[in-house]
Structures are given as C-alpha cells and as structure tokens.
Amino acid sequence: FVLPFDVLDSGRDLDRGWPYA
C-alpha cells in the first residue's frame, strides 16, 4: 500500500497515474 504523497504535494501526478511520480 502506497500513500499518494505526490498527489497531496502536486496535482500534476494525477495525470501521471498516482501514487507514482
């Protein structure tokens, strides 16, 4: 399980497919 830290930090990662950055 990986928390969407990148999503919380920057919405741009949503387009990249979170929680991966």
Swiss-Prot record:
Q: Which GO CC annotations does the UniProt entry carry?
A: vacuole
Q: What is its main location?
A: other
Its subcellular locations are:
Vacuole
Question: What upregulates this protein?
Answer: By infection with Phytophthora infestans.
Protein transport as UniProt keyword:
no
Report a single Gene Ontology molecular function.
Answer: serine-type endopeptidase inhibitor activity
Where on the tree of life does the source sit, at the highest rank?
Eukaryota
Keyword Protein biosynthesis assigned: no
Q: In which tissues is it expressed?
A: Tubers.
Sorted alphabetically, the keyword list is: Protease inhibitor, Serine protease inhibitor, Vacuole
Q: Which family does it belong to?
A: Belongs to the protease inhibitor I3 (leguminous Kunitz-type inhibitor) family.
Q: What does this protein do?
A: Inhibits trypsin and chymotrypsin (serine proteases). Does not inhibit elastase, subtilisin, cathepsin L nor papain (serine and cysteine proteases). Protects the plant by inhibiting proteases of invading organisms, decreasing both hyphal growth and zoospores germination of Phytophthora infestans.
Any remaining note in the record? Has a single chain structure.
Question: Under what name is this protein listed?
Answer: Serine protease inhibitor 3
